[in-house]
Design a protein with these regions (language model features):
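Phosphate-rich cofactor/ligand-interacting catalytic cores and adjacent structured alpha/beta frameworks
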Residues: 2-89, 93, 131-197
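Long, hydrophobic/aromatic-enriched structural stretches that serve as scaffold segments
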Residues: 76-132
Length: 197
């Protein structure tokens, strides 16, 4: 026989697991949708879009779709880590890195060795975990709070930005250029009826 407290604890555990799985899947689907929207954005001079391969001879629209499909489960994994993983930022980042390296390998396998999304795997994985971490602690979720939390997680593992570039430098700085000017411009154009895809 079990006590009422034991049964209550067990029910709370089951409910939390259900909630965490549902939230992780939702965040993962949102990350996948973001990748597809970014791919569909046309024109993107020099980059792969719906109309052409830009400056690339080793990849096309369908190479990117293959990459998005194979890496999609990774973002839900990152969100699960944010919801249920280590509270310590450096330990959390170590787990994200492990998942990220596997996702990179999956991407390279699906694309015949072509790097279509290495930076996006890093950035959206970190953002997925940050969004989930805010949800875990009942904190307000916004683009700004997600980016700040992502920067906090990454900075706890890599405190010095010296020598960083690309996606890692952007993460260390809280994705500042994405927040301003990019996000306000995107929102304004969407309100004005522009096709933002």
């Amino acid at each position: 026989r079990h006590t009422l407290d034991e049964l209550t604890d067990h029910v709370h555990t089951l409910l939390w697991q259900w909630y965490a799985d549902a939230q992780a899947e939702r965040i993962g689907r949102t990350a996948q949708r973001a990748m597809l929207y970014e791919l569909a954005a046309t024109p993107k001079p020099g980059l792969v879009d719906r109309r052409n391969n830009g400056a690339h001879t080793d990849m096309d629209f369908y190479t990117f779709i293959d990459s998005v499909c194979i890496t999609a489960p990774y973002f839900a994994q990152c969100a699960r880590e944010g919801l249920c993983g280590p509270a310590d930022g450096a330990a959390l980042f170590a787990r994200l890195k492990m998942h990220g390296l596997k996702a990179e390998g999956d991407m390279l396998g699906a694309t015949g060795g072509v790097n279509t999304h290495k930076g996006e795997i890093f950035s959206l994985g970190l953002i997925s975990a940050a969004w989930a971490r805010l949800t875990r602690y009942g904190a307000p979720v916004s683009a700004g709070s997600i980016c700040k939390t992502a920067a906090d997680i990454f900075s706890s593992a890599v405190p010095d930005a010296h020598g960083l570039s690309g996606a890692r430098l952007s993460a260390h700085g809280g994705f500042a250029l994405a927040l301003n000017p990019a996000l306000p411009i995107l929102r304004r154009e969407a309100q004005n009826g522009m096709d933002t895809a």
